[in-house]
Structures are given as structure tokens and as C-alpha cells.
Amino acid sequence: MVPAWLWLLCFSVPQALVEVSPTTLHVEVPENYGGNFPLYLTKLPWPHKEAGGRVVLSGDSGVAAEGPFSVEAESGFLLVTRALDREEQAEYQIQVTLEAEDGHVLWGPQSVTVHVKDENDQVPQFSQALYSARLSQGTRPGVPFLFLEASDGDEPGTANSDLRFHILSQTPAQPSPDVFRLEPRLGALALSPEGSAGFDHALEGPYQLLVQVKDMGDQASGHQATATVEISIVESTWTPLEPVHLAENLKVPYPHHLAQVHWSGGDVHYRLESQPPGPFDVDTEGKLYVTGELDREAQEQYVLQVQAQNSRGEDYAEPLELHVVVTDENDHAPVCPPRGPPVSVPELSPPGTAVTTLSAEDADAPGSPNSHVVYRLLSPEPQEGPEGGAFQLDPTSGSVSLGAAPLEAGQNMLLQVLAVDLAGAEAGLSSTCEVAVTVTDVNDHAPEFTSSQVGPVSLPEDTEPGTLVATLTATDADLEPAFRLMDFTIEAGDGEGTFGLDWEPDSGHVQLYLLKNLSYEAAPSHTVVVVVRNVVETVGPGPGPGATATVTVLVEKVMPPPRLEQKSYEADIPVNAPAGSFLLTIQPAEPWNGALRFSLVNDSEGWFCIQKVSGEVHTARPLQGARPGDSYTVLVEAQDADAPRLSTSAALVIHFLRAPPAPALPLAPMPSRHLCTPRQDHGVLIPAPSEDPDMATGHGPYSFALGPNPTVQRDWRLQPLNDSHAFLTLALHWVEPREHIVPVVVSQDARVWQLPVRVVVCRCNTEGECMRKVGRMKGMPTKLSAVGILVGTLAAIGFFLILIFTHLALARKKDLDAPADNVPLKAAA
């Protein structure tokens, strides 16, 4: 018994026994204290001066007004008034407050935690006084088959509750006194190696064990308790399993029972492992199940390992193996190989030539009917008849070869082959395989010319070498570009090498060129034979008649071209010369057998023109933009009208002169003439002003032109007749009938005159005489009087007609009223 003053001394030293925290005081009290009470626990941090008031204790349910704790108001000591039991309550939470009479808090609250220190006052207890267990023969040594359970009411984790298990006795003691082994800390009962060796020969037992549990750990002192364990030894039922054959895609309710295992010992848990993992399970009774459909193509066989384990997952014995073999069902159709690039078959290949071999894969069991694949050609369908189809198919090997029907180059065909398992039975699964076939070309066609006869082609004998004579075209029915390459040669008709060939091998066109000068006297004609051949050797028959083309060339004798009087010409003209002014005449140097046609070239300004037949050069329009002192060059070309290739040319240089002064004496208007409208074949003859000796001093011909007025040039046409006269006619079909003043410009050398020509345009009769409108004659009736006379005449005629018809009517009536006897004889007849 510890004296009270000692406890007071201990609790008065906070540094030793009291754990002080900023907010909570911790105090430890031994349970079942046997000393005097009250027991001083600790001194609270009470106010230094008497504050008065009352002390209030509050806390958990173990602290009440009549509870085991109190506070001495004078000293501030916390007291416990009776013994505490840790098993009843291990800890108390207290709050101490000093309050005034009115409830006002003077001090606190102060939290205090009281820990009840454990004493070894509890005896261990087994969960059962008698344990029963079954031990199967074949149990591995060291694997617990029974777990003893005991409890101690003292504080966990302390020596007071640290339990140890021991076997006190074993009955019977055969074959060894240590048949079993008990794990001291866990209470796990297992077979010892000595006991396991004994059980291999014969069954023993039952066994009875007296076991003990003691607290205080490995210390000699402590409380203890005992229990009895009865162990029966049973024969092992852990026997190997026969393989199970299970059909794939089995349509049964799942889970589906496969087999059952049984561990004859007690406290067993079954565990299942599948290699590879599969849809399998085991229940608490050891029944094995498949939980879903199996697929043989995914996994042909499973190895199931079943383990019998204790509650800690330790195997009692070696696992049992169950082999599950998945049997095949015809659940997979043949799989065709992927469609590859087209298979090339040469044209003209003989029947039986191998094309390709199909190999459809069936995922069902190899060697079984489910994977026995046969083949059938779907497209193109086999044809009846002596030739048969274009392809043949071996139904067993899937080999495709050529049939007797011919194939054409360039054909692209798609073969469809049906692959059927179950050796082609009706219930077999099938797939359609496709093979693309292309018939490649061979050089079995010789090239041929599109035309075997060309010409005749006429060439002048002065034709320059290098001139193209003719172009020949050849075709080749082959498709391959390499087989269409052609080579051309001159086979006959060109012994002197007068002609040559030029071509591109892949063009199909060949040009026949002239290589040497022709001679009409040496050979007036040539017959050139050209042959075409393939560059690549032809398969089959050689070139036919179409491979030869004949070109006929006729040589024309060359005539010399015409010559002009001069190699170049020069002429002068004032810059104000009107349109139609004469410059000069171009003449050939010698008479030409044919007709010459003249033309101007390089007249960029369009100032001049030349008569095609006569060669006279005139101004085509006013020389606007020309400056005195400048020169203008055009090219005069003369060609034979029948042979345009016979031509010559000469340069015409025109010098522009300053405009001469206008004549001082104006011309008198010419007397008026008349023309008919609508236009008839009549005109007005305009002479040159030769009457005036001052104006007719020139020596050259006269030129006539219309004035620059656009309306005049539109309505009238002026044609020169000779060097001194011109002919004026209407240019339009209809011109307004009236008197017109037509300005005509006349020029001679550098002198210019303007003649105002009076022309009366009128309507004409058939003889071409002008019908002129006349004025009203004296005494001629007016329109009104003429109408009156006409109306009066018609009225008089009408009046006389009325009298006549009235008289006739009255006479007829008188005749009808007379008696019959008075009718004249002539009338009666």
C-alpha cells in the first residue's frame, strides 16, 4: 500500500508526473488504488488571491456532482475520491471553472485529462472451452488448420494483455508426443513435420490436446487459462481431376457446372486460378463453374488450379489441376487473302497457264471438316461449249489457270471465287474471294500505213533540199508503248539518195524530205517505196502489205520569173495631192506571155494604190502627215496570174514636194446635166479644163477625184475614162431628186483645179427622159370643180336610168292585164 503523502508528493511535482500543455493538463491515476482517499492528483493554476466564488466541474458522463473527482477550493488541488477501474473507463475529460454567484466566470475553464493506468487484474479467456477440428491426411506440416482465440480485458498493447499459447499435453502420444505445433503468439495449430511423417503410413487419432493461454508475454508470472482441443484425423479426398471437354459457343445457362473438389479437413477456403485467365469460378463447396461461352480460336485449352487454403490463404496441400479442352465448332467462315495488285497474264498465253492460287484461311480446328475449304468459281461463270470459259479453277487447291477461251490485250477482269468449309457441304460457311487479272499486251501486230498510195506530189525542179515532200502515218494495234515503236526505211525508188526520212519512234508519223536537187531532164518523176517495221521483234506473222507505202513525186520544169523595167523606181508628188493623183506606171522589161498582177507591199500609211492589171500607181487618199523633203518607200510586186510563184519586186521611192500655189483664175461652173433615180446606166462625162490655155500648159495626164466631203463620196462615183476625161455616176440606188453641186478635183503635174459640176437628179420614164414637175396652167379646173362636175354627171346618169326602168315596169304591167284573145299571134307562139 503506497502512503497518501507519497502520492501527494508525486502529484505536487508537475515536472515529473504531470504533462502540461498550453490548454490541457494530463494526469495519470493507477486503477484499483488501495490507499487512502481523497487522493490528490495535481494542483491547478489557481488565482493567487482569494477570488471567491464556487468551483464547477464538468466533463464526460463519468464526471458528475457526486462523481469521483473534486477540487479543494482553498488550495486548488484536484482530488479523486474513490478507486478507478480502467476496464470500466480508461480516461476522463474534466473542465474546471471558478464562477461567481451570478454565474460569471472568474477563472477557467481549465481542461484536465485523467488517464487510468492499467493493472494486470484480468485473466485471459479462451473463446471456447472445447475446440473441435478435422485434420485431413496429406495436410502440409506447418500449415495451421485451427486458430485458437483468447482475450484479455487489460489494456491492449501492454504486457498485461500480451498472450502466449502453449500445448500442455497430447493424448495419445503416438506416433510422436509432438505431432502438433502451436504458434505461441497467434494460437495457430498446425501439424509438425514428425506428425506429418507419421500420417503418411496410417491413420491415427483422434487426438486431444490440453492448451494454455497466459498473459504477461514471456514472463513467468501472469494469469492463465486452459482449453481442450479434440482433433479427428480423416482420409484425404484431395484427388486429381479428369480433363473436361467443353464445346465452344455452348448455349447453356451460365454459370455451368464442370467438376467438384473436396477438402476433407475443416476450415477450408477454395481458390481458383486459370492459365490463361478464363471465365471460370469456384464456390465455397468446391464446385467448379464456367461462367461464359468459350472460343476455341481464342484459346484451345485452359489449366485450372484449385487450392484448398486456410483462413490466412495458406495451401493445405498441392493444388489440383483441371484441364479444360475446348472442342471446335464450325463458327468461322473461311477468310480470303487480301485483294492484292492485279495479276498480269500475257496475251496469247496457252490454256492451262497458271494465274494464281487462292488460299483461304479457316480459323476452326486444323485438319477437321470445319476447316476443310473447297473453292468454286463464281465470276466469270464457266461457259458451255467447245471453248469453255476463260479460266479454270481447281476446287481443292484453289489454283486458277487459263481456259480455252482467248483473251484480248488490255482486258481487266475481276475473278470471284467462293471458298466454302465443311468440304463444300450445304451447311458450310463461305466467303467470296476476289482476284484482279489484267491481260498484258504482246507485240503480235505489225504496224501498217493508213494509206498505201500518196500523191502524186508536184515539186519544182528548183525546190530547195530540206523541203518536206509528204507525211506518212502508220498505226500499230498493240497497246504497249514499247511495242508501238516504229522504224522506217526507203526500200525502193531512191537509188541516188535524193530523198530522206525523219521520224520519232513513238509518233507513228514519218516525214519524207528532199535531200538533193531535182532535175526534170534527169528524172521527171520518182516512185519512192517506204517500209515500216517494229523496233521490237514481232511475235507471230511478219509485216503484211499494209507495211508498205508508195509516194509518187512529179518534177515540174521551172520557168524564169518576170523582170521589171527598173530595179527601183522614184517619183515626186506634192504633199497636197488629192486622192487619185497619178504617180507613174510600172511596166515589165519585156512582154510577158501570161497576165501580170501588180500589188504594193509595205504601204504602212495606206497612201497609195496600184492598178492590178495596168500597173498605174495613184494616191489612195490625201497625204495627211507627209512632209516636204521626206521620202516614202513601198515595194511593188508583180506576179504571174496563173503561177503566183513566178514573181518579182522592185522598190518605189516617193519624194514629197512642197505644195504649189493654187491657180489664180477660178473655173466657171460646168453646165448642168441630169441623172435618173432610181439609178440607171447613165452618167455625166467630165472633161479636163483644156479650154483655158493658161491652165492647160502641163504635159502629163489629168487626174480626177471627188471632193473630200464624206456625203459626196458616199452618194457619187467618179471613174477616169482616159487621160483627159472622167465619168460621174450615182453610187447609191436612190438619191433625192433635186439639183446637186458635185465638187470634182482635177490635177495635172503639180497643178490642181476644183470643178463644181451641176447635176439634176430626177425621176425618169422608160426611155430615160427626165420627168419634171410643171406649174398650174391658166384656165385649168381646180380639184373642187372637177369633183363637182363628176358628181353632177353621175347624178344625171342615175336620173335617166330611173326613168327607163320605170317605163319598162309600167309597160309590162299593161301587157299582163290585157285579155288572152288580144294577145298577138307572135306572142302566143
From Swiss-Prot:
UniProt cross-references to InterPro entries, sorted A to Z: Cadherin, Cadherin-like_dom, Cadherin-like_sf, Cadherin_CS
Annotated transmembrane regions: 787-807
UniProt-listed Gene3D superfamilies:
Cadherins
UniProt main location, coarse: membrane
What PROSITE patterns would the database entry show?
CADHERIN_1, CADHERIN_2
Q: Which membrane topology term applies here? A: Single-pass type I membrane protein
Which stretch is the leader sequence?
1-18
> Any idea what this protein is called?
Cadherin-16
| Organism field | Oryctolagus cuniculus
What gene name does this entry carry? CDH16
